[in-house]
Curated annotation (Swiss-Prot):
InterPro entries: PS_Dcarbxylase, PSD-B, PSD_type1_pro. This is Phosphatidylserine decarboxylase proenzyme. The keyword Cell division does not apply. GO terms for molecular function: phosphatidylserine decarboxylase activity. The record marks G225, S226 as: Cleavage (non-hydrolytic). Its EC number is 4.1.1.65. The modification Pyruvic acid (Ser) is found at S226. Catalyzes the formation of phosphatidylethanolamine (PtdEtn) from phosphatidylserine (PtdSer).
């Protein structure tokens, strides 16, 4: 019953017109009136922001804010893998032989997430990490490793919530939502960085031009809170011993090591 009611409410409100109206509003000067309340409600750390709160002219500018230089030091340990985002690690687990993962009791197919069995094949029996960005988080995405972009592609159109309720009751948002996948190679192995759009403000913007990425380099940003899924090949990563789910992480913090 709860699942049915949740999905009904989402379908009634989640359509292209409402998304366009919200996008127009958040980019308008009128939205600036909400900035002080937004910052207070979501307890945004203003000390870290590149600009003073009053200098953001729209909510959109605040959503995609940059941070002061040096605010997010990048772990430089050899072969370390860093968190690409400020987020909550919602889940960590093994990718099954049939390409399925289980997140919050719901089964997802990474073949569906990536768009094909061929794309998913290299990640079978590997590891997945789910990183959820709330509206309070810094929304820019950074490369978790140094490596070379092998492929980049987008899938899906519409997006549903990717918060805990969305993961529990939604229509497989991790594999159905609009998403942009960047596959990076390093040490002879691959990592898939799956950037998943959020309900209403369904936007992911790439900011890197080169196929060569440096660990910690900015690669994209979300226009609103969303989710990043990291997929690793079998035996390609050793998690840092302190990493568990759920827990908060920030850009640049070590989450593991490439083997």
């Amino acid at each position: 019953m709860l699942k049915w009611l949740y999905r009904l409410m989402i379908e009634l409100t989640n359509h292209s017109l409402s998304s366009k109206m919200i996008a127009i509003f958040t980019k308008s000067r009128l939205s600036a009136l909400l900035i002080p309340s937004y910052a207070k409600i979501y307890d945004i750390n203003q000390e870290e922001m590149e600009k003073n709160l009053k200098n953001y002219e729209t909510l959109q500018q605040l959503f995609i804010r940059k941070l002061k230089a040096g605010t997010r030091p990048i772990d430089q340990t050899k072969n370390s893998v860093i968190s690409p985002v400020d987020a909550i690690i919602e889940d960590i687990g093994v990718i099954r032989e049939n390409s399925e993962i289980v997140v919050k009791g719901k089964t997802y197919s990474i073949a569906e997430m990536l768009g094909s069995d061929e794309a998913a094949k290299k990640y079978l029996n590997g590891l997945f990490i789910i990183l959820y960005l709330s509206p309070s988080h810094y929304h820019r995405i950074h490369s978790p490793i140094s490596g070379v972009v092998q492929k980049q592609w987008a899938l899906g159109k519409k997006s549903y919530p990717v918060n805990r309720l969305g993961l529990k009751y939604g229509k497989r948002p991790l594999s159905k939502n609009y998403r942009m996948i960047t596959e990076v190679a390093a040490n002879g192995k691959h990592i898939a960085i799956v950037k998943i759009g959020a309900m209403f403000v369904n936007s992911i913007e790439l900011t890197h031009a080169s196929e060569h990425l440096t660990k910690g380099q900015e690669i994209a940003y979300f226009s609103f809170g969303s989710t990043v899924v990291l997929l690793f090949e079998k035996d390609s990563i050793e998690l840092d011993e302190r990493i568990v789910a759920p827990m908060g992480v920030k850009v640049g913090e070590r989450i593991g090591y490439l083997k």
